[in-house]
Amino acid sequence: MSNGGTPRSLPSSGQKSIQEICHPLSAEESARSRSPDVLNPGEKDLSLPNGTPVDTSSPASSSSLLNRLQLDDDLDAETRDLFVTVDDPKKHVSTMETYITYRVCTKTTRTEFDLPEYSVRRRYQDFDWLRIKLEDSQPTHLIPPLPEKFVMKGVVDRFSEEFVETRRKALDKFLKRVADHPVLSFNEHFNAFLSAKDLNKRQGLALLTKMGESVKYVTGGYKLRGRPVEFAAMGEYLDMFTQKLGTIDRIAQRIIKEQTEFLMELREYGPVYSSWSSFEEDLHEPLEGVSGCVSNCSSALEELTEDMSEDFLPVLREYVLYIESMKNVLKKRDQVQAEYETKLEAVVFREDKKTPMPTDVEKCQDRVECFNADLKADWDRWQNNKRQDFRQLLTGMADKNIQYYEKCLAAWESLIPLLQDKQDAKGETN
């Protein structure tokens, strides 16, 4: 996402005011500034962030750009010392329940681990346990979201191959985000999750811990007078971002529904020409060609619809959950600040002015400063991740659409020789 002009820095952290923070998909930002990223191809040669030019002479440039973006990500991996992947989902059936486990593989050079490699199996509730522990032990940090646990029965089969694969990708992304975090990745519970063969002994009262943590920050009895401007801007931006994502999600689902209905019509449409060809000796090949074209177009549309359902929508929903996590951290920060303001006010209005500042007030002030610093750092990290994620998402969407139209174009172009040959043969006969 390009920046519109020179941003006006806020006093304490350099964050933009809400008027200057633009949604990553908004056109308003480009309207304010003629950024090099949004110039027309005729005005400026397209290039990657590293300066490599992008060839726009053919539709294949989108695929090339997608591959180069992935190579840029591979370069970042050279500086990492902790690699985590989630794969190999397996279904387990017992007399009590049916569930899915996933293999979690870890490779690391960190001294906090006893071995350089681990391979353990975890189910969804283990991932949930980890997130609860991270929220409890790291309340000042933004914890990445997990995919939603519950699904509507009768609408989604939670044991279907498509659902399990979508969840696997989300769980893999969750662990990778934690592993890339400079603080969360060193958490003892994360270490246990990656290395312990059995988490049952470590899980303990996770639910009670979460309930206690919730009560601690929600029922503190302190009322915040007002958020600092930078945190107020964060809250307003999150509200706006939620609205934009919700709108895109609803429209995308309507598009998928319409594409699915169109796909069903195409599947009925093509065979009609094939059936017709059996009664037309002279038109047999052209009619069979049309039937094949429609069949190829329907297959291409099916792939496009599946990509939108399995790759595009999950990213939108992940960021909706991410926003909820960020809002929860903001609320916790507000509670800590409200507690500090209340205690400080009590000290200011006390009769004995010569008594030193109470220790609990100083500790509360330290908590506020720590919360602010951690939240600002996580906000910057989240913004960077968001830009990268949406850049890859939109580039991938463009690439898939180009492939779809290329396949349809090739299918219909293949029909032209059949029609021309038929016309030439008819002319020779006459």
From Swiss-Prot:
<dbReference type="GO" id="GO:0035091">
    <property type="term" value="F:phosphatidylinositol binding"/>
</dbReference>
<dbReference type="GO" id="GO:0015031">
    <property type="term" value="P:protein transport"/>
</dbReference>
<keyword id="KW-0813">Transport</keyword>
<dbReference type="GO" id="GO:0000407">
    <property type="term" value="C:phagophore assembly site"/>
</dbReference>
<comment type="function">
    <text>Involved in the regulation of endocytosis and in several stages of intracellular trafficking. Together with snx4, involved in autophagosome assembly.</text>
</comment>
<dbReference type="GO" id="GO:0061709">
    <property type="term" value="P:reticulophagy"/>
</dbReference>
<keyword id="KW-0653">Protein transport</keyword>
<dbReference type="GO" id="GO:0032456">
    <property type="term" value="P:endocytic recycling"/>
</dbReference>
<dbReference type="GO" id="GO:0034727">
    <property type="term" value="P:piecemeal microautophagy of the nucleus"/>
</dbReference>
<feature type="binding site">
    <location>
        <position position="153"/>
    </location>
    <ligand>
        <name>a 1,2-diacyl-sn-glycero-3-phospho-(1D-myo-inositol-3-phosphate)</name>
    </ligand>
</feature>
<feature type="binding site">
    <location>
        <position position="167"/>
    </location>
    <ligand>
        <name>a 1,2-diacyl-sn-glycero-3-phospho-(1D-myo-inositol-3-phosphate)</name>
    </ligand>
</feature>
<feature type="binding site">
    <location>
        <position position="125"/>
    </location>
    <ligand>
        <name>a 1,2-diacyl-sn-glycero-3-phospho-(1D-myo-inositol-3-phosphate)</name>
    </ligand>
</feature>
<keyword id="KW-0472">Membrane</keyword>
<dbReference type="Pfam" id="PF00787">
    <property type="entry name" value="PX"/>
</dbReference>
<dbReference type="GO" id="GO:0000423">
    <property type="term" value="P:mitophagy"/>
</dbReference>
<dbReference type="GO" id="GO:0005769">
    <property type="term" value="C:early endosome"/>
</dbReference>
<dbReference type="InterPro" id="IPR027267">
    <property type="entry name" value="AH/BAR_dom_sf"/>
</dbReference>
<protein>
    <recommendedName>
        <fullName>Sorting nexin-30</fullName>
    </recommendedName>
</protein>
<comment type="similarity">
    <text>Belongs to the sorting nexin family.</text>
</comment>
<feature type="binding site">
    <location>
        <position position="123"/>
    </location>
    <ligand>
        <name>a 1,2-diacyl-sn-glycero-3-phospho-(1D-myo-inositol-3-phosphate)</name>
    </ligand>
</feature>
<feature type="domain" description="PX">
    <location>
        <begin position="80"/>
        <end position="201"/>
    </location>
</feature>
<dbReference type="GO" id="GO:0031901">
    <property type="term" value="C:early endosome membrane"/>
</dbReference>
<dbReference type="GO" id="GO:2000786">
    <property type="term" value="P:positive regulation of autophagosome assembly"/>
</dbReference>
<dbReference type="InterPro" id="IPR036871">
    <property type="entry name" value="PX_dom_sf"/>
</dbReference>
<feature type="compositionally biased region" description="Polar residues">
    <location>
        <begin position="1"/>
        <end position="18"/>
    </location>
</feature>
<feature type="domain" description="BAR">
    <location>
        <begin position="223"/>
        <end position="428"/>
    </location>
</feature>
<feature type="region of interest" description="Disordered">
    <location>
        <begin position="1"/>
        <end position="66"/>
    </location>
</feature>
<feature type="compositionally biased region" description="Low complexity">
    <location>
        <begin position="57"/>
        <end position="66"/>
    </location>
</feature>
<dbReference type="InterPro" id="IPR028649">
    <property type="entry name" value="SNX30_BAR"/>
</dbReference>
<keyword id="KW-0967">Endosome</keyword>
<dbReference type="InterPro" id="IPR001683">
    <property type="entry name" value="PX_dom"/>
</dbReference>
